[in-house]
Amino acid sequence: MKKAFLVFLSVVLVTTVFLVKQQESVAQAKQLEYSGEEIFKGFVFAQGEVGKQLPEVFNKAMTDKLNTKQAKAFANQVVADIKKEDADFFDNLKKAVYSKDALKVDELLKKAGQIVEEKVEAAKEIAASKDDTSRVQAELVNTVDTANYFYYVSYVAAAGALILIILAIDITPIAISDNVDREMAIRTLVDELN
C-alpha cells in the first residue's frame, strides 16, 4: 500500500512540475512582443521573425526577393520615412495588432501604403531612366528626399536587382487592392502574433 501511494505521489508530482513548466513557457512566448517596426517589416517586406511567421501571406520566392541586402536597405528607409511623417505610427501599429483591432491595422497600413507607393514610384522612375550607374547616382545625389533612400544603387551593377525588389513590393499585402485578400492577410498577421 505504501509503495502504491509513493508511486501515485511521484506521478502527481512529475505531472504537476511538467504542467507548471509548460505554462511558464507559454507565458514566456506570449510575453515576446515585436516592435511596430518589426511587425511592419515582417508584414510588408516579409523580413525578420514576423515575416517567417506568415507563410500564408508570402511564398518562398517572394520572401527571398524581399530579404536581399538591397531590399532590407529599402525597407529600413521606408521605416525611417514613415517615422518622419508620423512618429507614433509604429507604436499605434503595435497596439492595434496586439489588441486584435484588424480595422485599425488596416487603416494604419493604408496610410503607410501611400508612403510606400510614393517611394516605389520614385524607384521605378529612377530604374526606368537608368542608362548607366554613374548618371543615376548623380541624379540621386541631386534629389534631396531620395538621395539617402536609394544609396544602395551604387552597389547594383544593373537596374535588374532594383526592379526585382520593386516588383516584389508591388505584390505585398500593403499593395493588395483586393479587399478580401487584404483582410485575410491582416487577419493572419493579427492571429499569428496573438
Curated annotation (Swiss-Prot):
Residue ranges the record marks as coiled coil: 104-131
Entry-linked InterPro entries: SdpC-like (IPR023888)
Keyword terms of this UniProt record: Coiled coil, Membrane, Signal, Transmembrane, Transmembrane helix
Signal sequence, start to end: 1-29
Gene Ontology CC entries for this record: membrane
Chain ranges passing through the membrane: 149-171
Intracellular or extracellular location(s): Membrane
Membrane topology qualifier: Single-pass membrane protein
Name of the protein this chain belongs to: Uncharacterized protein YitM
Taxon lineage: Bacteria, Bacillati, Bacillota, Bacilli, Bacillales
